[in-house]
Regions:
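Membrane-interface transmembrane helices that cradle and orient dolichyl/undecaprenyl
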Residues: 143-160, 195
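Intrinsically disordered, polar/acidic, low-complexity terminal segments
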Residues: 4-60, 66, 72-92, 101-106, ...
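Membrane-interface alpha helices of multi-pass inner-membrane proteins
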Residues: 159-175, 181
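Signature aromatic-anchored transmembrane alpha helix within multi-pass, membrane-resident enzymes
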Residues: 157-162, 202-205, 261, 309-332
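Membrane-interface micro-motifs in multi-pass membrane enzymes
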Residues: 61, 65, 108-151, 173-174, ...
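Hydrophobic, aromatic-rich transmembrane alpha-helices
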Residues: 90-99, 186-190, 243-265
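Transmembrane alpha-helix segments characteristic
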Residues: 110-118, 199-206, 260-283
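Perimembrane helix-loop-helix junctions
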Residues: 180-205
Length: 480
């Protein structure tokens, strides 16, 4: 089989796995928040014109990302179809990354790059959200596609007009994806590098400026400056932008050796500089995780462009082992997500029928997922997942009664005359007295320590009396 065809099959398998996972993933968090635009108790759009107005408000008050605006309308589609669209996004991102690395005809190197993308990108940071699929996977693939196209020669004026429109849209997808590319391409032009098509680059740059300097993005940038960073600057970079840091070191070496000008004028140099700029934008947010998505992807292209002659000689048995691991990982993720989705459906139906928000059930905890899933799955939210719980409450019109999940044993452990403290069989504690050292963390729950373990204290009311459910806190990667 020609290696080009083998690479296409590899990309297809990755895309199918992503589609199956997303089809099994329930809507939650931001997905429900955006769904509320067209449905639910707070719906305020019921026409194309309303959607345009909502997009304008989003550009002014939230962010200027076209990915979000498009996503709002596409939520009207059946979930299976939306999952298929996102699977195509995944294929696009992988395909463009492999093409720009020059690996379309090198199956071994392409397989290793695909493995790095599957295991090293921050998929764990809520990438199972359809909203994040649009914001990061789709935006990344579209911006890389546009980067290739601005250096291509249109076949006709009509083709040029079509590409210009699409490049404008690509530039508006996400500021951390398009703006660094625009700066890097501009520098390349200044240094007498390969000239892009002026019309296509102008369209892409216009879209990028529209999102980067939208009022919503500017307000977000100002607000992020007042927030406490997730970690120190160095640790932020190491955790979110490790590959981009390697590229930054390479750029410094090129400067020292006097080769920066020629390097920056090349397409690989453009992506290297874009990676570092995107890294700076992401680190300025102070958030660990998906903020490094674009910087890392661009960095992978640069790194694999240089190392592909070496890794292409990787023994077939190692490549086969990598592919087997990738397949095992994808299968485990899909299987586990299907299990969690069944539990979530049970939880959501019980919550919708509940008059006080209380749901009894022994649902799978987030930390029970097999390591091989790499935190890419989601089920019933934990007690400290306040935002996820409130989004569900808002979409179901039950803001006054957000979900409170209690172990099934509470039904028999807490009777009408219960007072005091009882330890359940799973180790959780039910008490009628709030722990003295309990400190409020977010709306609706408190934090305490039990034998050195950080625990969530969740108040609930039964038989007209207030009780407290104390359980170990499970911090998910990506929690802010």
């Amino acid at each position: 089989m020609p290696e080009r065809n083998a690479v296409k099959i590899l990309i297809t398998v990755v895309a199918v796995a992503a589609t199956l996972q997303l089809a099994a993933t329930p809507f939650f968090g931001d997905d429900l928040a955006y769904m509320g635009v067209f449905s639910g108790p707070n719906a305020h759009c019921d026409s194309f014109f309303d959607w345009l107005l909502n997009g304008a408000r989003h550009w002014l008050n939230v962010n200027g990302r076209l990915a979000n605006i498009l996503f709002t309308a596409l939520l009207l589609l059946p979930k299976w179809l939306l999952a298929c669209i996102c699977g195509c996004f995944t294929a696009l991102m992988y395909s463009e990354t492999i093409k720009l690395s020059g690996l379309s005809k090198n199956f071994t190197s392409a397989a290793i790059l695909a493995g790095v993308m599957l295991f090293a990108l921050p998929w764990w940071d809520y990438m199972m959200l359809f909203d994040c699929q649009f914001n990061y996977v789709f935006s990344c693939g579209m911006c890389l596609w546009a980067f290739r196209k601005i250096y291509a020669k249109p076949k006709s004026k009509l083709h040029l007009a079509f590409l210009s429109f699409v490049c404008l849209a690509c530039g508006m997808m996400h500021e951390a994806a398009s703006f660094p590319l625009c700066i890097a391409v501009s520098l390349s032009i200044f240094l007498s590098g390969e000239k892009p098509n002026k019309v296509l680059f102008a369209s892409f740059a216009t879209g990028s400026l529209l999102v980067t300097f939208s009022p919503g993005i500017i307000m977000r940038a100002l607000e992020s400056g007042s927030k406490t960073p997730d970690d120190t600057p160095l640790m932020l970079l190491l955790k979110s932008d490790s590959a981009a840091l390697i590229v930054a070191v390479g750029i410094i070496i090129a400067v020292i050796r006097g080769k920066f000008r020629s390097f920056a004028a090349s397409k690989t140099g453009v992506l290297a500089i874009a990676s570092v700029i995107s890294m700076a934008i992401g680190s300025a947010s102070g958030i660990i995780g998906r903020t490094g998505w674009f910087a890392q992807t661009y960095a992978f292209i640069v790194i694999f462009t240089f190392i592909s002659p070496t890794i292409s000689r990787t023994p077939k048995i190692i490549t086969a082992a990598l592919l087997a691991t990738m397949l095992f990982h994808a299968t485990a993720v899909v299987a586990w997500q299907r299990k969690l989705s069944g539990e979530y459906d049970t939880f959501e139906k019980a919550y919708a029928a509940s008059s006080d928000g209380i749901v009894y059930g022994d649902f799978t905890k987030d930390n029970a997922a097999p390591i091989i899933t790499l935190n890419k799955t989601r089920g019933v939210p934990d007690a400290d997942d306040t935002y996820l719980l409130l989004c569900l409450a808002g979409q179901l019109g039950k803001k006054d009664f957000p979900p409170i999940v209690l172990p099934s044993e509470v039904k028999t452990a807490v009777t009408e005359n219960f007072s005091g403290t009882v330890t359940l069989s799973n180790g959780d504690i039910i008490t009628s007295t709030k722990p003295k050292d309990a400190k409020p963390l977010e709306t609706g729950f408190f934090i305490t320590h039990c034998s050195g373990t950080e625990c969530v204290v969740q108040p609930f009311t039964l038989y007209g009396k207030k009780y407290y459910h104390i359980s170990p806190r499970i911090l998910d990667p990506g929690d802010r």
